[in-house]
Amino acid sequence: MALDAGLTRTLRELVLGRSVAALGTLHSNEPFVSMVPYALYGEERQFLIHVSALASHTRDMLAQPRVSLLITAPEGGDIAPQALPRLSVQGDALRLNRAGTDYAPARACYLAHFADAAQMFELADFSLFVIRPVSLRFVAGYGKAFSPTPATLALILGSRN
């Protein structure tokens, strides 16, 4: 089954309409899940997160960069929890170097979505990470599961920051 216009719209609204995701990492070889705000960055529509070195998930990403994100539609209405639209992203987390050429535009992108995070950029323990999608699983409801490519997701989401 292919993504039709309605499913494409559902996926786009899900990712662009939410600002937080569950982040799955490996912590001492055990699964660990936390919550992170995200912004979409670059032409590839990668996921940009800003995290503290004090957080377990930051140390986990540095030790093992393979991560997962889960974005879900909010509960409520007439939709059963099992039928909520959701996107699971498996990807690689890369910490951006503050002196690198990608850092300033990534910082501007993140702050465009989360202006109240500006003061955290002044703290030395916070870092920006880009999560580059490798594989995806989009569930739009019962019997509606798809595995779009990262390139397809980027096209669906558009190329704006």
Q: Can you name each region flagged by the protein language model?
A:
Residues 22, 33-37, 88-90, 128-130, ...:
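Conserved hydrophobic/aromatic beta-strand scaffold that supports enzyme active sites
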Residues 1-62:
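An N-terminal domain-cap segment
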Residues 25, 35-36, 58, 76-80, ...:
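Catalytic micro-motifs at enzyme active sites that drive phosphoryl/nucleotidyl and oxygen chemistry
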Residues 52, 72, 141-142:
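Surface loops and adjacent helix of pleckstrin homology
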Residues 56-113, 126, 133:
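Short, structured beta-strand-loop surface elements
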Residues 4-9, 108-109, 113-161:
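C-terminal edge-of-domain segments
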Residues 44-46, 66, 135:
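Structural motif
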